[in-house]
Amino acid sequence: MSSNRKDDHVRHAVDQHRDRTPVNDFDAIGFQHHALAGIDAADVDLGVDIAGKRWHTPLFINAMTGGSAAATDINRGLAIAARETGLPVASGSLSAYFRDPGLAGSFRVLREENPHGVVIANVNATATLDQARRAVDLLAADALQIHLNAVQEIVMPEGDRSFRSWPRRIEHLAAGVPVPVIVKEVGFGLSRPTVAWLRDAGVAVADVGGRGGTNFARIENDRRPAADFSFLDTWGQSTPACLLDSAEVTGIALVASGGIRSPLDVAKALALGADATGVAGRFLATLLDRGAEGLIETIRAWLDQLRSIATVLGAATPADLRRCDLLITGEVAAFCRLRGIDAAAYAHRSHWWHPSERRSLL
């Protein structure tokens, strides 16, 4: 991918997120309020175990960019924000680095500015094992993230048209790299059978990457001179739908990204079964508008607000949010009916009033 195209992606992605709060399927998910369910904020621990590491928070900065001068500045700002807030951070696709090793610095800055944090290297599904290992080595990465973007590719005039080998390649990478593998969709969602297949292929984490956030089909369509693909603007499943669809798949961690707009969306995603949540476009817009200090301030506010939400809901850990009652309505409820998911059961999960569930007040 050329540096110009990388910069185009950044510009279009920011345009989708700046100065608006789009409606998405997280609006169809609500918490049933229980006025006596609250705990003490001091009892809330936001830490989670993901991909063999202890993360201080269930929130991370998801894959964005790299491979240009502008991308170097962006990655520096993201790395500084990650360092100061304790958030893990994922690189953009390292494809540009594989074509031109001279671009290494635009990615390596993520580790240079964040020497002790969790850094994740990102490659596409056609990366060779040698390339994947080089990506991990370049960033001293704690995990390898493989992105799936078939829909984006078909909208790109110059995009890939061959996807049959992707499953075999993913298995090869998962078996051959020295770090845990994360597989993420870029905004069109992972289905239940896909997540189960990834688990069986040796993948440690599935990032469902659902519809509702940055729309890469729309970004690529905006770059096309002809042959409009705007009919794909609503392709795929939303992040809440994907989490519900994969809730019963065991043996693999789930990450929610795609359409996370606020700390409340983070809490909803965790309550739907995510082990962690990733944010890309919204944090990118904040960085470009307010700089690294502005992003640090925003992330710290999100973490404080997430802790407050967990306190009111009586959730001492992110996993405890899965026992909170959820009201699932609208198109997400319709999706559940079609996929054989008991949405009503999510409204009757909590037992906060039972003596065995409450800490002594003494």
From Swiss-Prot:
Enzyme Commission numbers on file: 5.3.3.2
Gene Ontology annotations for the cellular component aspect, listed alphabetically: cytoplasm
Xref: Pfam families: FMN_dh
Compartment(s): Cytoplasm
MF GO annotations: FMN binding; isopentenyl-diphosphate delta-isomerase activity; magnesium ion binding; NADPH binding; oxidoreductase activity
GO biological process: isoprenoid biosynthetic process
Cofactor (UniProt): FMN; NADPH; Mg(2+)
Predominant localisation class: cytoplasm
Keywords, in A-Z order: Cytoplasm, Flavoprotein, FMN, Isomerase, Isoprene biosynthesis, Magnesium, Metal-binding, NADP
Keyword Isomerase: yes
Residues bound to substrate: 5-6, 152
Binding site for FMN: 63-65, 93, 122, 184, 214, 259-261, 280-281
Residues involved in Mg(2+) binding: 153
Enzyme class: isomerase
InterPro entries in the record: Aldolase_TIM, FMN-dep_DH, IPdP_isomerase
Reaction(s) this enzyme catalyzes, per UniProt: isopentenyl diphosphate = dimethylallyl diphosphate
PANTHER family: ISOPENTENYL-DIPHOSPHATE DELTA-ISOMERASE
NCBIfam families documented for this protein: IPP_isom_2
Assembly, per entry: Homooctamer. Dimer of tetramers.
Family indicated by similarity: Belongs to the IPP isomerase type 2 family.
Described purpose of this protein according to its UniProt entry: Involved in the biosynthesis of isoprenoids. Catalyzes the 1,3-allylic rearrangement of the homoallylic substrate isopentenyl (IPP) to its allylic isomer, dimethylallyl diphosphate (DMAPP).
Name listed for the protein in its UniProt record: Isopentenyl-diphosphate delta-isomerase
